[in-house]
């Protein structure tokens, strides 16, 4: 600091700079802007530590009195550092006290925001948001809150969005709504076909392939039911009149009787053993 004092008889004042090392001047200048609570000056060790984080911003001050005979200016360096250096200053100030006045080693670690792993921060963020798959140790945390519905796809068409999941051949809720309805219809149709085939085989019905162009194929088919057969030539089912009896007799292999002998017909005599007697 610059000390002002008046000489005894001259009546003029002189500015005398206090002699000292550059470190003392920097310490006193730093104490001017950042006074300590107990009134003491800033420790030189703290000034040296803060100088390591200095961003080289300077402030030039002029003498306080305009009538001063001194024409020079004093350059004092202020520690207006970055947030990382501001965080490191309390640690650097507390380190000598913890070491009982011993100098701080050069490799003393400082707390800095730059040392924070952005990968760890990003992994913790994405694990909470479930925006991307996490790797490493964050897989367990991401897998705990993972929803299996997000990875579900239809086994038939491969879609992932459907209003309703239906059961399919690959298990429950393996088909989308449209594919599940189609699969259900085909399953019912196949079951109905199997039931019809089983009923026809139980009655002993055997379908014979008829020859093309044969007369038997042109005949009127009989109405076949399970266990009985009704002829199309019987009118009224059973117990009614028989239509086309001659054709029915021929069908039953019955030969009709011969015509009745007239009165003029002569029956021949039979030859016997007593014919010549």
From Swiss-Prot:
Keywords: DNA-binding, Flowering, Metal-binding, Transcription, Transcription regulation, Zinc, Zinc-finger. One of its GO terms (biological process) is floral organ development. It comes from the Eukaryota. It holds the Pfam family GATA. InterPro entries: Znf_GATA, Znf_NHR/GATA. A zinc finger (GATA-type) spans 154-179. Residues 58-74 have a biased composition (Low complexity). Gene3D superfamilies: Erythroid Transcription Factor GATA-1, subunit A. Residues 52-94 are annotated as: Disordered. CDD domains: ZnF_GATA. GO terms for molecular function: sequence-specific DNA binding; zinc ion binding. Belongs to the type IV zinc-finger family. Class B subfamily. Probable transcription factor that regulates organogenesis during transition from the vegetative to the reproductive phase. Regulates the expression of CYP78A11/PLA1, HD3A and MADS1 during reproductive development in rice. May act upstream of CYP78A11/PLA1 during panicle development. Acts independently of the photoperiodic and gibberellin signaling pathways. This is GATA transcription factor 15.
């Amino acid at each position: 600091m610059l000390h002002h004092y008046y000489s005894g008889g001259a009546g003029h004042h002189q500015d005398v700079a206090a002699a000292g090392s550059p470190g003392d001047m920097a310490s006193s200048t730093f104490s001017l802007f950042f006074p300590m609570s107990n009134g003491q000056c800033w420790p030189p060790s703290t000034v040296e530590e803060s100088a390591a984080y200095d961003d080289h911003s300077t402030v030039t001050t002029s003498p306080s009195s305009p009538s001063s005979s001194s024409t020079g200016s004093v350059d004092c360096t202020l520690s207006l550092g970055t947030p990382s250096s501001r965080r490191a200053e309390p640690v650097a100030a507390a380190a000598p006290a913890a070491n009982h006045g011993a100098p701080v080693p050069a490799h003393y670690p400082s707390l800095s925001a730059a040392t924070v792993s952005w990968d760890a921060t990003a992994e913790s963020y994405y694990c909470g948001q479930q925006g991307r798959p996490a790797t490493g140790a964050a897989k367990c945390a991401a897998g705990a809150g993972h929803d299996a519905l997000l990875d579900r796809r239809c086994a038939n068409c491969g879609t992932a969005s459907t209003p309703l999941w239906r059961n399919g051949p690959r298990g429950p809720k393996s088909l989308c709504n449209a594919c599940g309805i189609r699969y259900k219809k085909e399953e019912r149709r196949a079951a109905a076909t199997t039931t019809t085939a089983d009923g026809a085989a139980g009655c002993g019905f055997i379908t014979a392939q008829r020859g093309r162009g044969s007369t038997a194929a042109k005949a009127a088919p009989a109405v076949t039911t399970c266990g009985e057969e009704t002829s199309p030539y019987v009118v009224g089912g059973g117990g009614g009149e028989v239509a086309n009896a001659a054709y029915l007799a021929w069908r039953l292999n019955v030969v009709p009787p011969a015509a009745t002998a007239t009165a003029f017909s002569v029956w021949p005599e039979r030859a016997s053993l007593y014919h010549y007697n």
